[in-house]
Amino acid sequence: MKASELQGKDQAALTKELNDLLKAQFGLRMQIATQQLNNTSQLKKVRRDIARVKTVMNQKDAK
């Protein structure tokens, strides 16, 4: 997901996206804990997507 895609969304859509990503991150962490996740780079991607969403949300709040 690119930041330019996120900047076109409104605050409600960004909040929903953030909640979805946080749920995905929790699921991936549980899979790592139970040793079911083979591709651990997925967690890194989700973590960075969360950071992107939060950054765009903060930028919109500052305006």
Swiss-Prot record:
GO cellular component: cytosolic large ribosomal subunit
S-adenosyl-L-methionine found in the keyword field: no
InterPro entries: Ribosomal_protein_uL29, Ribosomal_uL29, Ribosomal_uL29_CS, Ribosomal_uL29_sf
NCBIfam families referenced in this protein's UniProt entry, alphabetically: L29 (TIGR00012)
Family assignment from sequence similarity: Belongs to the universal ribosomal protein uL29 family.
Species the sequence originates in: Herminiimonas arsenicoxydans
GO BP annotations listed: translation
Keywords from the named record: Ribonucleoprotein, Ribosomal protein
Superkingdom of the organism of origin: Bacteria
GO molecular function: structural constituent of ribosome
Name of the molecule in the record: Large ribosomal subunit protein uL29
Pfam families (alphabetical): Ribosomal_L29 (PF00831)
